[in-house]
């Protein structure tokens, strides 16, 4: 019983460490879209291209896209 608990714990820790390292790598890859050089317009253009109608801003050295835009209700036909 103790061996299975230890194995389960080690798998859980390994999964957590892998997830944290993957997230850090992802954030590092997003680091530069103009925010590192102080050119926010590059970030804004990127966000507008990915999410039409959204805006972009820099937080730290990362480009963040604000997609909290209310959607229009669908038009009623008929």
Curated annotation (Swiss-Prot):
Q: What's this chain's function?
A: Has antibacterial activity against the Gram-positive bacteria S.aureus ATCC2592 (MIC=0.8 ug/ml), S.aureus 6A (MIC=0.8 ug/ml) and S.aureus 15A (MIC=1.6 ug/ml), and against the Gram-negative bacteria E.coli ATCC 25922 (MIC=3.2 ug/ml), E.coli 23A (MIC=6.4 ug/ml), E.coli 27A (MIC=6.4 ug/ml), P.aeruginosa 3A (MIC=3.2 ug/ml), P.aeruginosa 7A (MIC=0.8 ug/ml) and H.pylori NCTC11637 (MIC=6.4 ug/ml). Has antifungal activity against C.albidus ATCC2002 (MIC=25.6 ug/ml). Very low hemolytic activity against rabbit erythrocytes.
Report the family membership: Belongs to the invertebrate defensin family. Type 2 subfamily.
One GO term under biological process is: innate immune response
Q: Which organism is it from?
A: Haemaphysalis longicornis (Bush tick)
Give the residue range of the signal peptide. Answer: 1-22
Give the location in the cell.
Answer: Secreted
Please report the propeptide residues according to the UniProt annotation.
23-29
Any single GO CC term annotated in Swiss-Prot or TrEMBL for this entry: extracellular region
The disulfides recorded in the entry are 35-58, 43-63, 47-65
What are the entry keywords?
Antibiotic, Antimicrobial, Cleavage on pair of basic residues, Cytolysis, Defensin, Disulfide bond, Fungicide, Hemolysis, Immunity, Innate immunity, Secreted, Signal
Please identify the protein, giving its name as recorded.
Answer: Longicornsin
Chief subcellular location: secreted
Tissues in which the protein is found = Salivary glands (at protein level).
């Amino acid at each position: 019983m103790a061996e299975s608990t230890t194995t389960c714990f080690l798998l859980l820790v390994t999964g957590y460490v892998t997830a944290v390292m993957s997230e850090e790598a992802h954030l590092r890859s997003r680091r530069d879209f103009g925010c590192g050089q102080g050119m926010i317009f590059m970030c804004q253009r990127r966000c507008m291209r990915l999410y039409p109608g959204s805006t972009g801003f820099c937080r730290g050295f990362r480009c963040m896209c604000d997609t909290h835009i209310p959607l229009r209700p669908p038009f009623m036909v008929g």
